[in-house]
Swiss-Prot record:
GO MF assignments: 8-amino-7-oxononanoate synthase activity; pyridoxal phosphate binding
Subunit note: Homodimer.
The species this protein was found in: Maricaulis maris (strain MCS10) (Caulobacter maris)
InterPro entries documented for this protein: Aminotrans_II_pyridoxalP_BS (IPR001917), Aminotransferase_I/II_large (IPR004839), AON_synthase_class-II (IPR050087), AONS_Archaea/Proteobacteria (IPR004723), AONS_Proteobacteria (IPR022834), PyrdxlP-dep_Trfase (IPR015424), PyrdxlP-dep_Trfase_major (IPR015421), PyrdxlP-dep_Trfase_small (IPR015422)
Binding site for substrate: R26, H138, T353
EC number from the UniProt entry: 2.3.1.47
Cofactors: pyridoxal 5'-phosphate
Annotated transmembrane regions: none
HAMAP family: BioF_aminotrans_2
Name listed for the protein in its UniProt record: 8-amino-7-oxononanoate synthase
Keywords: Biotin biosynthesis, Pyridoxal phosphate, Transferase
Cited Pfam families: Aminotran_1_2
Catalytic activity: 6-carboxyhexanoyl-[ACP] + L-alanine + H(+) = (8S)-8-amino-7-oxononanoate + holo-[ACP] + CO2
Family classification: Belongs to the class-II pyridoxal-phosphate-dependent aminotransferase family. BioF subfamily.
Amino acid sequence: MTSASASLERFAANKLAGLDRRNLRRRTRETRPLGGALVERDGRQLVNACSNDYLGLSQHPAVIEAAAAAARQFGAGSGASRLVTGGHPLLFELEARLAAFKGTEDCLVFGSGYLANLAITPALVGSGDIIFVDTLAHACLHAGARLSGARVEVFPHNDMAALEAMLKTLRPVHRHAMILTDGVFSMDGDLAPLPDMMALAQTHDAWTLIDDAHGIGVIGGGHGSTHAFQPSVVPPLQMGTLSKALGSYGGYVCASRDVCDLLRTRARPLVFTTALPPASIGAALAALDLIEQDSALRERPMDLARRFCRTLGLAEPNSPIVPIIIGDESAALSASAELEDAGFLVTAIRPPTVPRRTARLRITFNAAHSEADIDRLATTLKSILQTAEAAE
């Protein structure tokens, strides 16, 4: 079938050619989960070392059965926005459970973590307000900030002195202010300095939104990055996902009852999106049960990350995310291909996901990995890096 728009085809072809020249074209490849940390690609079995399924719960029998039971009881889909048809009982149960788990009055579940961050900020601030966002915060935090219509100022990564200077200068001339950051940064694995940030927010009357997508389940006893500090902190807006450590799908924000009520009316990605299917909610509830009950499960990804870093002589990790910075995009792709040849799935992460000249292997640790998997990954990667260095 021939496209009706030749100019569109030329545009796409030219853009793709440019991406190819810079080793930046993205491709998707069929990959079949085999259970645990194993996947199959092109007929070969690989150890998956790049998934965000940190606790392996997407493959846990209890989580799978809970998803199936919810679908049998409530159906395959939700049919409409919650504001049109209401929500099934499991959805309200999950929101109450998440609020209690995160130490807030209320919670609101969205269709995904990305949608949650597109929803929260534009519902709370706009023209005449100002947003301060960490330069390495997730793309959806930046997107939500831009959508709001507020002034957006980007501060250097985790630089509280720079943030303080910006707050002192700019906060007094704006009506409301927000500070946006990841709790655990998805590409670097480091944590935001939340106590210092919260102190600045208190001093300058700024509302702090923490994206804890990569914290819940594995950091701070499972409660997330807010509990990684002593004492723990309670930001007014705690966002997260159901799709990583919880092994399901969806996003949420935990906040006060009034703030959540306001979002129910003003958050467009909630108002105008069909609610999550029952299976996703049932799976998330079962996953939350396991996280609350099993401390060994929660701690295993960090234990494996530490083991890996010790073998390679790397610094102590802050999270189950360990980046190996390669720099050059072509070299990162080559290292990823060599790991795949050796039986490991570790995708090369390239711009614009990460800054230019910081292409990397983003290695993540899963409770389903064995110690033997991690030891072999470390020794294989060490050999690949040494060979590449010798060839320079």
